[in-house]
Amino acid sequence: ELGHQVMAIDSNEDRVNAVLSYVTNAQIGDSTSEYFLRSLGVANFDVCIVTIGGNFQSSLETTSLLKELGAKLVVSRAERDVQAKFLLRNGADEVVYPEKQLAKWAAIRYSSEHILDYIELQDDHAIMEVTIPPEWMDRTIGEINIRKKYNINILALKKDGKLDMSITPDTQLCRDESMLVLGKYASIQKCFRL
């Protein structure tokens, strides 16, 4: 969908067939086989993502082989911190925790009716879509002075599913709007009483 060439690899033919319409190329094969990976030319790939679930040994072997064969960037999936340590020691450039990240997102997203969406950034920062507190209605962004009081930036206002990023200190906050804010998670919690 983003215009990149994507190759999917799996040892299970049914899983390969299930993703055919989403990828440029799909191969049935054993990712722990050096011969198989070499035949695909993994050294020419910009990014290799290892998402093997349920068999950490295969994930570790695949990660290590990809790096040995010259893969530029290897991103591997882990379920626990100890797995991440092994993956990083054996060739992974980055490790993702899809289940853990989704659980955290859901916990934050559904912890308050005022949080409409949440994107975690580094160093305890986040972008959140939040409802506008009732006491801010019909006031301007300059009047509430959120940047000075809480060190939070308003990135955009959202109404009827459309983002308005052309906001100024004179922009008035209205009912049925939400706002996209950027700041430290703790500051956002404090400001919006989450």
Regions found by a protein language model. Give the residues of each.
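Cytosolic regulatory regions of ion transport systems
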Residues: 1-194
